């Protein structure tokens, strides 16, 4: 029978809505898990935010100028002979270079780490709030510092093999200390302010402690790192960028836990950057001076020769006045030739610093080519003048060009000397680094808030992972869709039954049957619908034996068996309920009966049926308990005596209901189910999984047993308040009638 007789057809919501509400169901069902994870992660984040050592940031601002302003009025165009404009990216790389950063590493001994030995997590936080020296250690042990302890190490050299290894320095009092390391032959003792040199098998140790403010027993952490490694780490930590596109303003910043040291590092870097720029400009000016100083005698000799040739011509031919055309040509020729010679001088000077492929040299080459073309054109024009005027113009031009070059060269040399002596570069320090007062990290509120968000995300992930790996079935339709079995009844979770179950564990004798205590409870109403479905299912079953089982323990199989038997009995049927779970069965407690005698005694032949059956535990319902738990229940159930008993029960009762152990736990159920006409499987909301249900069906099929239907037990509509309502038309289980009270008969029986 494939029709579900326990529920009317449902109006299905769109599939997209069902997916959404299922997700909401998972979140609602795991809300406490999500809240717990979020609270823990948020607490960890807040702990970190308030206990972590604060991080400070120091920054500097430098300006890169095209030419130094202080020299423009003095130098004029001479700067173009040696000043090559650099872009911001090049200056950024210079600022980050080993040449600049290395000076800060050396001057501040950044490769030496010396700090108090703090207790993990909270030690530094406690010390930051102390006002005086502390008593070292934790309960006198460990040498931990908790106060204003201070150490200043001016020099610390170790063999290369010990670089990066931690040393422990312990204050001994009276200005003395002890240095320890696992690689040292013996601990080394020294005096504050005095250089220490100790020869060990690994090499020589040199140490100079300038300051040691601590009580005897206080420990400090000391470490000497590689200079190159320290330099590279500092380069990586530097943040350098141009402030605005092509602004020429470069900002550099550094983060560190010691505000004073961080500011000192940035000031050292900025100072060295400016100093190297000035030094580079002075060196360039010096090279230009050397070049021009070698060129000056040649120009002087060239000028003297030109003047001598001009004078010889005048003495030979006398004074000759140029025409207006000749005068104009002479002036233009002098200007052009002078420019050409200056360009050639500039090219020669640039070649002392750069190769011929440098962009500056190539630009000069292009200008020389243009100017040479002009000179060639003027030379051709000169031939159109009379011969005597040609000679006069040529000689006068040579004199004026050589004179202009000579005078210009003298001026350039004087200006270059001013550049060299003036110590002026094309970069200047706009803002030095000030000691930061407020930390930039951690931002307490931000970290705490982000930790809370991360906690919620992790909680949601954990909820879905838990639901995927361990989550049970939450909707009866999933069972039908994935197994093909009909869900005969959906039994809601009963608050009254929860109370009864807690009373059941006290082993106090009484009747704890929900069908008797609250006969109109919604759970019992659903079992009545199961009774109807079972009646139709048994029409072609072959016999009146019904086996109830489940995939795993804890699905509520015994609750369903006991109350279903009572419900069927109240319908006028003679019913026998047999507790065949001879490993953990406890149905006798529902009726306030003893475990023995029971089924074990019948199988062993020690008792008769009349001696074992508890008559009329509920009107129309007889009951057989398990008896004492045997050590071989499977073998007993295989006994032919069991077959005889089942045949006898079938003949004496309208319906025989057998409660069996979980299928996935033991094999007992398959033995009994093979003789039954109807087998029902009890599953539990949020506990039974599809994998367990499929495996149960598979194992029973191996024993030639067919599961007729499923009972979906302990549905809690309040847990999945979205999906269940959407799938089933937003109805809830309610009692139809007046407020339920335990029946007087049930109260009397329990008493």
Swiss-Prot record:
Catalytic activity: L-tyrosyl-[protein] + ATP = O-phospho-L-tyrosyl-[protein] + ADP + H(+)
GO biological process: polysaccharide biosynthetic process
EC number: 2.7.10.-
Record-annotated membrane-spanning stretches: 32-52, 445-465
Keywords noted in UniProt: ATP-binding, Cell inner membrane, Cell membrane, Exopolysaccharide synthesis, Kinase, Membrane, Nucleotide-binding, Plasmid, Transferase, Transmembrane, Transmembrane helix, Tyrosine-protein kinase, Virulence
Cytoplasmic face residues: 1-31, 466-751
Annotated Pfam families: AAA_31, GNVR, WZC_N, Wzz
Primary localization: membrane
Compartments, record wording: Cell inner membrane
Keyword Ion transport: no
Stretches assigned to the Periplasmic side: 53-444
Key word Nucleotide-binding present: yes
Stated name of the protein: Putative tyrosine-protein kinase EpsB
Source species of the chain: Ralstonia nicotianae (strain ATCC BAA-1114 / GMI1000)
Gene: epsB
